[in-house]
């Protein structure tokens, strides 16, 4: 059965993305409110039990370019960038910059100047929120991110208030933090990249039998910034059960390319039960050119 709540919210998100493509620009996806303005009484089923942050990745220190900062946040200035990944997709109507608190190594506390789901704004990706602001420096790094406001999951069943996670240091490379089977109604087979830096990733080929989404702690490319290709595709190892035997499957294609985010779709030509994803060290880098670590993630859904 299709998830009716998600289908409705997907229509809202799609409308938001279309507005961003028009006059509103990418800034239409961002929020710079310094205080929590979510009326939590409107979400009576939202519970804090089980709410988690999967990662917070200190990816860039004073290195988001002037133009990008202006387009995203409406303000100029070289800024820090830190993606925060939630255990569930988020209803962005409940998202304010003031919902986040960042503790630095010296004990001081700061908040982001703005937050946005971009560039991870394709269908099924609204669990990664990019914080932009001043989060210390390489000598005084952020240590913890905590949700201090009411951020509600897309299904309105979870409130992330109080969730916290340790920050991955600036010098560390990206790792896998989440994987899931993509529901068939979300596959978008044959979709071409829009060429935009948000919401425009490619779909898997028409012959795909199963799609697995993997989420990295931060955006990943080849060293130097080029998009991944067959080298990285062949490096992905999918552990799957076939007739009670664990086998290794290589994706025959990759999807969700061309949009500069932290997600890849592994396009499989088998329907075996996926158990785990593995990826070796040293093939991809974050925007700071830190190489990825050897990493694996177990499927939980």
Regions found by a protein language model. Give the residues of each.
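Bacterial N-terminal signal peptides that target proteins for export
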Residues: 1-9
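Bacterial N-terminal signal peptides
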Residues: 10-20
């Amino acid at each position: 059965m299709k998830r009716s709540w998600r289908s409705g919210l997907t229509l809202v998100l799609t409308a938001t993305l279309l507005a961003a493509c028009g006059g509103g620009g990418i800034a239409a996806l961002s929020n710079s409110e310094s205080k929590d303005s979510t009326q939590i009484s409107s979400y009576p089923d939202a519970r804090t039990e089980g709410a988690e942050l999967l990662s917070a990745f200190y990816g860039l220190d004073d290195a988001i370019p002037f133009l990008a900062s202006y387009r995203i946040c409406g303000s100029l200035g070289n800024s820090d960038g830190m993606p925060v990944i939630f255990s569930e997709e988020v209803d962005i109507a409940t998202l304010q910059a003031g919902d986040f608190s960042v503790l630095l190594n010296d004990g001081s506390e700061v908040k982001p100047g703005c937050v946005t789901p971009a560039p991870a704004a394709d269908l099924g990706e609204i669990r990664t929120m990019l914080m932009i602001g001043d989060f210390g420096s390489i000598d005084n790094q952020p240590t913890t991110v905590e949700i201090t406001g009411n951020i509600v999951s897309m299904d309105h069943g979870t409130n992330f208030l109080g969730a916290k996670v340790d920050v991955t240091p600036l010098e560390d490379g990206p790792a896998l933090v989440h994987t899931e089977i993509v529901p068939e109604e979300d596959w978008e087979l044959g979709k071409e990249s829009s060429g935009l830096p948000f919401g425009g990733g490619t779909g898997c080929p028409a012959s795909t039998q199963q799609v697995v989404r993997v989420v990295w702690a931060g955006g990943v490319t080849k060293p130097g910034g080029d998009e991944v290709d067959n080298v990285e595709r062949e490096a992905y190892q999918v552990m799957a059960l076939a007739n009670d035997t664990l086998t290794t499957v290589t994706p025959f294609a990759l999807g969700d390319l061309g949009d500069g985010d932290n997600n890849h779709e592994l396009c499989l030509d088998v329907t075996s039960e996926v158990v785990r994803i593995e990826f070796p060290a040293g093939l991809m880098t974050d925007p700071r050119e830190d190489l990825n670590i050897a990493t694996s993630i177990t499927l939980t859904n």
